[in-house]
Every structure is written in structure tokens, then in C-alpha cells.
Curated annotation (Swiss-Prot):
PANTHER family: PYRIDOXAL 5'-PHOSPHATE SYNTHASE SUBUNIT SNO (PTHR31559), PYRIDOXAL 5'-PHOSPHATE SYNTHASE SUBUNIT SNO1-RELATED (PTHR31559:SF0). The gene is pdxT. This is Pyridoxal 5'-phosphate synthase subunit PdxT. Keywords: Glutamine amidotransferase, Hydrolase, Lyase, Pyridoxal phosphate. Belongs to the glutaminase PdxT/SNO family. L-glutamine binds at residues 46-48, 105, 133-134.
Length: 188
């Protein structure tokens, strides 16, 4: 199994390190043809409007959207969640629209308002230390979306078929369980 990490912008190196810690072959993806070399893709946190703009410039946007619709597994964290969402409610921007959620950008505050919180994740025996940095908030989601974790009654980890998204940054912890969850999605 080879997992891609979108290297367009953002904290892709941290995801790469986390996946390598799990013994996974990792490829940093920056071109559309590189999607054909991987079995799944992680889209990191960063600046979502910049990511979309660059993805379109290098012709990655449309190919990725099509592959996801065909069942290609993808995991988006923070800005990655925004990119994958159906709609961004507080800022006019494009998104891939591959998971039926509506998000509000930077809903948990600015960079200085970043925080950590122990959250319960469906299927995990112990809580997960979630790190929120200018995190998006899910304000609505469709009936086919599974909520795997919440913070203050708001969904922060969700899945719809082959798409997994998190408001927080699991790659900034030492806990590999959410990345392992994604790898299990890819294996199926």
C-alpha cells in the first residue's frame, strides 16, 4: 500500500512522518498523474483557498474530484476538511464537494485561540487528544454522513463512504489511531 500526501501547501510533512511511523510507503503528491501511483490521499491543514488555487493551476483539482467520486479514499484535516466539504458557509470559495457537510472556516478562533481537547472517538477505547488550530466547524451534515467524534456537540471527525475529515490535527500528536483508521479504509 502506498499513501499520497498532498504536498501543495500546508503541514504535509507531519502527515508523512505519521504514516511512515506506521510503516507505510508515502508519496508527496503535487501533480495529477501522481494520484495514479497511490492507493489513498491525505489532504493536510494549511490555507484552503491557496490549496484550491494551486490544485487548479496544476490540474490536480478535477482529477482528484473524479477519483474520489469513483471511490478513491481521502482523508482531510482542517483545511483539508474545508476542501472536501460540500459548502463553505462564511467565505465564498470553491470546494471539491465530495462529503455532504457545510463548514464555517476558522470557527474556533484565530491562531492565538488554538487549543487541545480530549475527545471520544467512536470505536476507540481511550480518548484522543485533538489539537484545534483555526479549525473549521461543521454547521450541517447530510444523513449519509457518519459522525465519529464531537466537541461541544459539534461534529469534528466525520466519514461518508471513502471520505474521512477532521476539524483538528491528528498529525501533530504522537497518537496514530486516526491515521490507522484511514489506512483501514484504504485496505477495504
Amino acid at each position: 500500500m502506498k499513501i499520497g500526501v498532498s504536498g501543495i501547501q500546508g503541514d504535509f510533512r507531519e502527515h508523512k512522518v505519521m504514516l511512515e511511523k506506521l510503516g507505510v510507503d508515502v508519496k508527496v503528491v503535487r501533480k495529477p498523474e501522481e494520484l495514479d501511483e497511490v492507493d489513498g490521499l491525505v489532504i493536510p491543514g494549511g490555507e484552503s483557498t491557496t490549496m484550491i488555487r494551486i490544485m487548479k493551476m496544476v490540474n490536480l483539482y478535477e482529477k482528484l474530484k473524479q477519483k474520489i467520486k469513483e471511490g478513491f479514499p481521502v482523508f482531510g484535516t482542517c483545511a483539508g476538511m474545508i476542501l472536501l466539504s460540500k459548502e463553505v458557509v462564511n467565505f465564498p470559495q470553491d470546494s471539491l464537494g465530495v462529503i455532504d457537510i457545510k463548514v464555517e472556516r476558522n470557527a474556533y478562533g484565530r491562531q492565538v485561540d488554538s487549543f487541545e481537547e480530549q475527545i471520544e472517538v467512536k470505536g476507540f477505547e481511550k480518548t484522543f487528544n485533538a489539537i484545534f488550530i483555526r479549525a473549521p466547524k461543521v454547521v450541517d451534515y447530510g444523513e449519509n454522513v457518519e459522525v465519529l467524534a464531537t466537541y461541544m456537540d459539534s461534529p469534528v471527525l466525520l466519514r461518508q463512504n471513502n471520505v474521512l475529515v477532521a476539524s483538528f490535527h491528528p498529525e501533530l500528536t504522537e497518537d496514530t489511531r486516526i491515521h490507522e483508521y484511514f489506512l483501514n479504509m484504504v485496505k477495504k
